[in-house]
Amino acid sequence: MPKGTDRLIIDAPAAIGVARFKTLLKMADAVLLPVLPSAFDRGATGRFISHIESVKPIRKNRKPLGVVANMVRPGTRAGRRLMAFLDDLDYPPVATLRARTLYPELAEDGLGLFDRGDKAAKILQTEWTPLVTFIETLGADLS
């Protein structure tokens, strides 16, 4: 890891196989699994979780699995279905991030959400607090 780096996120492809997952897991302290509110994502997520729950570090909770409900529109049927699905899997989300037009605008400008301090960004930053806390708490547990 580069000097001065406290946290490093490795973005893996959605269709990663169990063998490649195990390789990446050796380098990781935890797994973050973003899930979109769609039937396709729910199906893929259910299958993926059933496969990785047999991997020893996940099964023994030595490498925590944090599910992130991503691009959720509150009050929609799709959002409710996603939350019910995650509840049924016994993986409540560590964070729920809403779908907002600010994200593509930030990407267009080459910025991240925490690069801006305006009201719109601050509102969305609060949604990230549980996820940041999950990651930072994990880091404290590993020290």
Feature-to-residue mapping (PLM):
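C-terminal lobe/tail of nucleotide-utilizing enzymes
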Residues: 65-143
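Conserved catalytic-core segment of NTP-binding enzymes
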Residues: 13-99
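P-loop/Walker-type NTP enzyme "switch/lid" segment
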Residues: 1-10, 14-18, 26, 107-118
